[in-house]
Amino acid sequence: MNPNQKIITIGSICMVVGIISLILQIGNIISIWVSHSIQTGNQNQPETCNQSIITYENNTWVNQTYVNISNTNFVAEQAVAPVALAGNSSLCPISGWAIYSKDNGIRIGSRGDVFVIREPFISCSHLECRTLFLTQGALLNDKHSNGTVKDRSPYRTLMSCPVGEAPSPYNSRFESVAWSASACHDGISWLTVGISGPDNGAVAVLKYNGIITDTIKSWRNNILRTQESECACVNGSCFTVMTDGPSNGQASYKIFKIEKGKVVKSVELNAPNYHYEECSCYPDAGEITCVCRDNWHGSNRPWVSFNQNLEYQIGYICSGVFGDNPRPNDGTGSCGPVSSNGAYGVKGFSFKYGNGVWIGRTKSTSSRSGFEMVWDPNGWTETDSSFSVKQDIVAITDWSGYSGSFVQHPELTGLDCMRPCFWVELIRGRPKENTIWTSGSSISFCGVNSDTVGWSWPDGAELPFTIDK
């Protein structure tokens, strides 16, 4: 091959290589453009993934779904119109109680940042259930937990966290400054009632969607106090019961009707010889039933039921299966206060089913220990002590405490009835144990018409803690 042919051959090869390289570069550019177009086109397409977050903006619940596309997060939003909880359904028929939650707050608090609390309770919206609780402005196993046996102080606040979680600074939200409280959701927003201030002039601050909407001043100047459990909502109105006056004698009791955080009506009960404290209230077929604590002279529980116009009836649970603590052994009941061991008491609850009643109570007749549910098929109206079902919740050898009712509306469960539920406070520390603090964890159960089991679900923390030694 002569020199000219070599030059032509080499030039041809270089040209072919150059053309191939150019084609590859053009293909690469086209590929990048197509990929970018696909990503851009998908930005406004909601897709399914595993993480959803609920936020609240301008009285509209917003479902935010995070969509992962090529390591980039986009947010697809779909508004859910708020609807007031009807509250018109009857209680669901049940045969027993299934465990719903247990927070193990004291066990976790031995090494973790967990609030010192008391008076926990549960309330549900149409989207979620939350545990509400009164903190002492302190953490377990810390010096500020000293002396937290005290009920009323300026450091106490109402806070909330997702049900079943130990209450900590990392999962809890502030609700109100309070040493006595109630809260509930009307289907549109949360209503909180927080009482704070001096014993002779406390004020209840009402908040709706976190904003102060009204206040209620102590009218007897003697420790204004409320339920320590959820209020009850029907057709956009929420109802709560408050007490003002002696804890060991005749006091004053009022029912309040609240709409969007504003008191629209109230009535004082005409209830001589009755004593109502720390009522546990629930809606049933459009009306409200509250079962309360008689701290004056009754070892059975007083009740008040009322309609949305606050027309009310009052009475005591007649059953000889007594529900308060302290109390006598079961025997002959009364539709008025049973005076034997009637002084003092503990917050509790019952659910009325016609003439029958589910009674929640401590197992011990003299101390806040153990817990059980008892079904008395005639107990709302009859005075005998016969019952047909008893389900163990906490063994008598383990501490219990306050207990109260809450419900899950059909808008949450999808059922055609109101599901009855209850929680039990498991108090630990002072005055019964050798610690510098008083706090508690909680368990909860919901009524079902299927298989259940009796057992013991105690607090389970090993005391004392490091701070106590």
From Swiss-Prot:
Record: residues binding substrate: 118, 152, 277-278, 293, 368
Annotated region (Involved in apical transport and lipid raft association) at: 11-33
| Region Head of neuraminidase, annotated ranges | 91-469
Gene Ontology process terms (BP): carbohydrate metabolic process; viral budding from plasma membrane
- The protein's superkingdom reads Viruses
Chain residues that bind Ca(2+): 294, 298, 324
Posttranslational mods: N-glycosylated.
Sites carrying sugar chains: 50, 58, 63, 68, 88, 146, 235
Q: Which UniProt keywords apply?
A: Calcium, Disulfide bond, Glycoprotein, Glycosidase, Host cell membrane, Host membrane, Hydrolase, Membrane, Metal-binding, Signal-anchor, Transmembrane, Transmembrane helix, Virion
Under the heading SUPFAM superfamilies, the entry gives: Sialidases
Q: Which residues lie on this side of the membrane: Virion surface?
A: 28-469
Cofactor(s) in the UniProt record: Ca(2+)
State where the protein is found. Virion membrane; Host apical cell membrane
According to its UniProt entry, the function of this protein is described as:
Catalyzes the removal of terminal sialic acid residues from viral and cellular glycoconjugates. Cleaves off the terminal sialic acids on the glycosylated HA during virus budding to facilitate virus release. Additionally helps virus spread through the circulation by further removing sialic acids from the cell surface. These cleavages prevent self-aggregation and ensure the efficient spread of the progeny virus from cell to cell. Otherwise, infection would be limited to one round of replication.
The text of the family note is: Belongs to the glycosyl hydrolase 34 family.
Q: What else is known?
A: The influenza A genome consist of 8 RNA segments. Genetic variation of hemagglutinin and/or neuraminidase genes results in the emergence of new influenza strains. The mechanism of variation can be the result of point mutations or the result of genetic reassortment between segments of two different strains.
Q: How does it assemble?
A: Homotetramer.
The protein's name in its UniProt record: Neuraminidase
User: What organism does the record attribute this protein to?
Assistant: Influenza A virus (strain A/Parrot/Ulster/1973 H7N1)
Lineage of the native species? Answer: Viruses, Riboviria, Orthornavirae, Negarnaviricota, Polyploviricotina
Gene name?
A: NA
